[in-house]
A protein has these predicted regions:
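Extended catalytic cores of very large enzyme megasubunits
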Residues: 1-492
Length: 492
């Protein structure tokens, strides 16, 4: 009880000194008597929407429950076969993934109109899907997909094709039945390309784990690039997710294949992953602003981050997520995303021009200290309460692991060996390798003992909390867009 009182005082101190939990925590934590079916989690990612009517409608149902709880949700829709493809069970041709996105769009509008918060959705789509061009242009149609943010999953292969001005194949996976019935030659490069795909069970797969994809159309990669750029310029969509880079830098690289993000895009997540957020208001740490003696209080900043890290970890226990799979996912990995807001305003208070070399160094310092302080607390919490369950588990070394991380083989790991999750996380994550460049002893301790969580940092746009709780400081890492503006409120 005495420790509870101590940390209560510490949490209040951190909140007064710039720690701002995300909107769902502020809105729903402690409000169980008035709205028991709500969550403290801002956003989630759906389970994989597989290519069947049952799966599509099942995920609509899950999304409805998630939105009802106050969470936003992201999905990948390029798992669905393209428009005009034959559906053998129905004896008809499919209308394609965009038409099914319309169902999710209407569902989101209907559910959110019943509550006090507008629903938020992210739809992601692979750049190699046959309907990718339709996806890119979808918001040119008035009123369509207005409950969605849209992002393209951009692969390294596509970027290389753009650089080399090569043709780009728009293709979709084939089953063995389709290969046999349609006489597809798997060795014909004009008919088939082999690609990584998020769903593998039902499709033809080679020894390298790549999926056979039937080419529907080939277009110049630079033409597609121009369409993406013009749409982004005209409508600010679709977003641009370098998905291979995301998976390469994912701390849980050995057990997750990320294909979607939360609605604002700051946190790529696996199936049923949750986005537990909080931000630190940097303007609170500027001493004697607008003077020659203006400086940043680094010691207090580090301590606020440490206390806030413990607070966000506690929120995992009261997540209030509606689906069993969501609750299991967050409890197993305990990921959260702490970021900062007010960077632009803080630079102004310090007399630093936004975009100058000095501002870049300050931003690097802020992000580095946020990460280091967070992982230090992650180690301390693991010692006190235990590491995230996944980091206490053991995993079998696979050929895929050794292919992704050649350093494992150099260190003596072989296929079939048993390796603790904490070592895969701390020693072989590319992100944790960057942390180790600054704090090698800390990362080595994390490899030996494990961390309380698998992920710590995530910088959100913070549009609402910057205005309502940070005295209209600039949001996220951006400069101030305007010093006064109007904002609509759904209801009073």
């Amino acid at each position: 009880e005495s420790r509870r009182d101590y940390w209560y005082e510490q949490f209040v101190w951190a909140l007064q000194r710039g720690a701002i939990p995300a909107g769902r925590i502020i809105s729903n934590a402690g409000a169980g008597a008035h709205k028991p079916a709500t969550s403290t989690i801002n956003c989630t990612v759906s389970g994989t929407v597989e290519d069947s009517m049952h799966q599509i409608l099942d995920k609509v149902h899950e999304a409805g429950l998630t939105l009802k709880a106050g969470c936003g949700i992201g999905y990948e829709f390029s798992t669905l076969r393209p428009r005009g493809a034959y559906v053998s069970g129905a004896g008809a041709y499919t209308s394609g993934p965009l038409s099914f996105m319309d169902i999710y769009d209407k569902m989101c509008f209907t559910v959110s109109s019943a509550g006090g918060r507008r629903g938020a959705q992210m739809g992601t789509f692979d750049v190699g899907h046959p309907d990718a061009m339709e996806f890119i242009r979808s918001k040119r149609e008035a009123g369509r997909l207005r409950q969605f943010n849209l992002s393209l999953l951009i692969t390294d292969d596509f970027m290389q094709a753009v650089k080399e001005d090569r043709p780009w194949a728009l293709a979709f996976p084939v089953t063995q039945k389709e290969v046999d019935e349609d006489g597809i030659d798997l060795d014909d490069e004009e008919q088939v390309v082999w690609r990584e795909w998020s769903v593998q069970d039902q499709y033809v797969r080679n020894d390298s784990g790549l999926i056979a994809c039937r080419t529907y159309k080939t277009i110049p990669a630079r033409r597609m690039w121009d369409v993406i750029m013009s749409s982004t310029y005209d409508f600010a969509e679709p977003g641009f997710v370098l998905i291979d880079r995301v998976n390469e830098l994912n701390n849980n690289w050995w057990c997750e294949n990320i294909r979607a993000t939360n609605p604002c895009g700051e946190q790529p997540l696996p199936a049923y992953g949750a986005c537990l957020l909080g931000s630190v208001n940097l303007t609170k740490f500027v001493i004697t602003p607008f003077t020659d003696k203006a400086h940043f209080d680094w010691e207090e900043y580090r301590e606020v981050v440490r206390v806030f890290t413990r607070m966000l970890d506690n929120v995992v226990e009261i997540n209030g997520l509606p689906l069993t799979a969501q609750r299991e996912e967050i409890l197993r990995k305990r990921r959260h995303g702490m970021g900062f807001l007010g960077l632009g305003s803080t630079l102004t208070l310090l007399g630093i021009r936004y975009g100058s070399p000095e501002s870049v160094k300050f931003t690097e310092d802020v992000a580095r200290e946020l990460a280091l302080s967070g992982w230090e607390m992650g180690l301390e919490l693991a010692r006190e309460k235990g590491p995230a369950p996944i980091l206490a588990e053991s995993f079998k070394v696979t050929e895929d692991m050794l292919l992704k991380r050649p350093a494992m083989e150099v260190d003596g790991w072989r296929v079939g060996d048993s390796i603790p999750g904490r070592i895969l996380h701390a020693r072989y994550s590319h992100y944790m390798n960057k942390v180790a460049e600054v704090a090698p002893d800390l990362v080595e301790k994390l490899a030996k003992e494990g961390a309380r969580f698998t992920h710590h940092s995530s910088i959100a746009p913070t549009g609402t909390i910057s205005l309502s709780l940070a005295n209209n400081a600039s949001n996220g890492i951006e400069p101030s867009f305007a010093h006064h503006y109007f904002r609509n409120v759904i209801r009073e």
